[in-house]
Amino acid sequence: MPVRVHNFLGKLGWNARKYLPWLASESYLKLQFVTRRKLQRNYIEYFMSAKEVPQPLVVNLETINRCNSTCEFCTANKYAEKRPYMRMEDELFYQIIDQLSEWGYKGHLTMYGNNEPLLDTRIVEFHKYAREKLPEAFIFMSTNGLLLTVEKVKEIIPYVDQLVINNYCMDMKLHKNIQKIYKYILEHPEEFKDVDVLIQMRYLKEVLTNRAGSAPNKPATDKVIKETCLMPYTDMWIMPNGKLGICCCDNFEVTDLADLHEVSL
């Protein structure tokens, strides 16, 4: 099927996230810890035994650091944003993609971070270039869908393997523009045979993690979580200013690992 609509645990899950947010949040975290432990052990063994440092599983390439949504769990929502405005230079973007191409990169690539990628007017052209240079990479776009139209979807799908539309709402209903897109895809499946379109029903006021103490709707805690986080080893996090960050939860971009103006990937 060219389009799927996913709502975690259906109406039961939605009501839990809406009416029992802290319980839902903590339960989800515990589930993640349980399901990921074996995968983490396997990855650590793989990473430590590799003759060369493995390529990242995911490259997150944020080209603009702004969002147009109001998700209460995120510091990038338009009412909570504190970061200085940044937009990646064209030259730097193309250099990064060229370096990934020289690397023979075949992992996942997304031009998404703590932002809405469609706010960058160059985003379709950027995806086109990435597709040409990285034919074996899995390129996906994650968007809140607020700026999406049928025409915009048709522009982007030739260059992505997956389009993820996060439908953030209060009523468990698709936004009107997303309804039109969903209907169009169902009526024209042949146009979408080479792309996976996933629409995720998301609660706008959901409580997730505390994002290393920065989440607007979940304060920091002194509780020590004795779990391993592998994101600095599995994900490459590139910000619009060319800095390589430690991970997506460093929302205010406090920790820099490198500057891609000075070093290569």
Language-model segments: which ranges?
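Glycine-centered flexibility motif
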Residues: 107, 115, 210-213, 258
